[in-house]
């Protein structure tokens, strides 16, 4: 479950997740750099999309975050030749940065998990290499913000009137150093930025998962549909610079399937029992997987892990693939008296905070003659197994489970191996 990662993050005093090179290629820029300083924030405002939806009414255990991703876009013309550019950023919600359509940074789930009212982490990047530095050249800054860590269930208790965070927001300051040595600050405001609900991410939150429609263009390609933002005054705490990523994606620890099977019906059902799945076919690890309408494909990665699934797959435009996560299988002929929620061999989800509509990825294919790569970047899951369905035929050429952690590979200074396989497994977890 998601608590598995949160406990780890709390112990480490950090909250960060990762992601490099997905949904848009390898992240660019020259990486994290020193902050511009607290006084630079005075040149900026928190801004939100005026058309962003807000969750209202008493929040229940199954309440989902508001639909849509907020996009913020600004185009800036260089007054002189630029020799250096630093962008100091902060978000109310999970945010991803782009310069001229190229992703910035290798972190995932910025800004990470902090006390919602007291602190937010800022991330400052050297983006000089992504800019057109010539005099009078235009450069586009854009940001996607989704509800995670702010306007979703992870920080909102049941019974609260709406989510604790109402609208996603972004705040940033760009420092340009010109060829003559002068510097100028450009901060977020309602005059020079556009904002709106846009892009392929149509829903995302920590407990909910992510809905991604590849037929939709990112916000930096649909600026004409955006409008003036509004000032957001929800957060009154401190913005503190991060010391590095709060969460790391660990592709070096990626898990491959150990077992894959397909079922479509169950047998042996009786009063109080769902029965047992009838396995229609199995796939050897490493083989392509075919998903047909009406089928359930169960993929076992062999161990529970805080992670995100990574796909290479292909399907017809408009086809939706749904991937739901689980920590265990139903057993005992699906006996309801044992808390089972489906036939033996199907994935068990009754233990989840949002068992019906949460902990899932919905991916709708766009037009492509080739297989495409996808990994959700605005959420994470705790799971060992996934169950996959599709509205039309889909071929999965590759699927992996990519761990997320508060510990980067560079922080690992050694390994421990014992003569006991179970202890070795515990250590590796």
Language model region names:
Residues 1-10:
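Bacterial N-terminal signal peptides that target proteins for export
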Residues 19-21:
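C-terminal motif of bacterial Sec signal peptides marking the signal peptidase cleavage site
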Residues 26-429:
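Extracellular/oxidizing-compartment recognition motifs
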């Amino acid at each position: 479950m998601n608590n598995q990662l949160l406990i780890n993050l709390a112990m480490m005093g950090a909250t960060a997740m990762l992601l490099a090179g997905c949904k848009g290629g390898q992240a660019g820029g020259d990486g994290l750099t020193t902050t511009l300083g607290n006084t630079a924030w005075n040149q900026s405002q928190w801004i939100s999309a005026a058309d962003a939806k807000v969750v209202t009414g008493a929040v229940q255990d199954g309440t989902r975050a508001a639909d849509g991703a907020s996009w913020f876009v600004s185009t800036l013309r260089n007054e002189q030749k630029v020799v250096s550019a630093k962008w100091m950023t902060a978000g109310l919600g999970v945010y991803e940065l782009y310069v001229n359509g190229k992703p910035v940074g290798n972190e995932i789930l910025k800004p990470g998990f902090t006390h919602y009212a007291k602190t937010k982490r800022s991330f400052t990047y050297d983006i000089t290499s992504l800019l057109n530095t010539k005099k009078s050249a235009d450069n586009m800054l854009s940001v996607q913000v989704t509800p995670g860590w702010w306007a979703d269930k992870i920080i909102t208790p049941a019974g609260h009137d709406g989510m604790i965070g109402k609208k996603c927001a972004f705040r940033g300051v760009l420092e340009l150093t010109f060829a003559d040595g002068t510097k100028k600050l450009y901060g977020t405001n309602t005059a020079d930025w556009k904002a709106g609900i846009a892009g392929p991410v149509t829903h995302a939150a920590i407990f909910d998962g992510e809905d991604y429609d590849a037929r939709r263009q990112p916000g930096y390609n649909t600026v004409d549909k955006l409008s003036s933002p509004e000032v957001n005054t929800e957060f009154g705490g401190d913005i503190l610079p991060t010391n590095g990523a709060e969460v790391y994606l660990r592709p070096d620890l990626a898990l491959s399937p150990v077992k894959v099977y397909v079922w479509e019906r169950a047998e042996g059902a009786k009063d109080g029992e769902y029965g047992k799945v009838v396995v229609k076919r199995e796939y050897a690890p490493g083989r392509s997987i075919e998903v047909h309408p009406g089928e359930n494909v169960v993929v076992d990665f062999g161990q529970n892990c805080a992670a995100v699934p990574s796909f290479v797959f292909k399907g017809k435009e408009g086809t939706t693939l749904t991937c739901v996560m689980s920590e265990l299988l139903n057993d005992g002929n699906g006996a309801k008296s044992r808390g089972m929620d489906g036939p033996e061999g199907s994935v068990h989800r009754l233990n989840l905070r949002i068992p019906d509509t949460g902990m899932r990825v919905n991916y709708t294919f766009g037009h492509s003659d080739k297989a495409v790569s996808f990994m959700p970047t605005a959420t994470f899951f705790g799971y060992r197994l996934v169950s996959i369905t599709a509205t039309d035929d889909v071929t999965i050429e590759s699927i992996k489970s990519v761990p997320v952690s508060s510990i980067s590979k560079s922080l690992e200074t050694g390994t421990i191996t014992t003569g006991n396989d179970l202890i070795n497994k515990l250590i590796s977890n």
